[in-house]
Amino acid sequence: MNVLVIGSGGREHALAWKLRQSPRVKQLFIAPGNAGTAQLGRNVDIKLSELDQLLNFARREAIDLTVVGPDDVLAAGIVDLFEAAGQDRKSVV
């Protein structure tokens, strides 16, 4: 499973740390991530406000699960954007 964690704080580091422990996770991406998350997966240089670029990245990397940490990204409508693009609601949490 390819997983994308969106955010750059401690919450996202904890999520990435736990996801990294799963044998089901093949690739772990964190956008934009931080120095700590770089040790767990691949940080992706996409700003949290660039929702279209996050969606394009998810498509390009065949992301199976997107975990959104920051509340403001959720409030900006990332789940609606991903759903409108054909991503299953269950795959964006």
How would you name each of these model-derived features?
Residues 1-93:
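ATP-binding N-terminal substructure of ATP-dependent carboxylate-amine bond-forming enzymes
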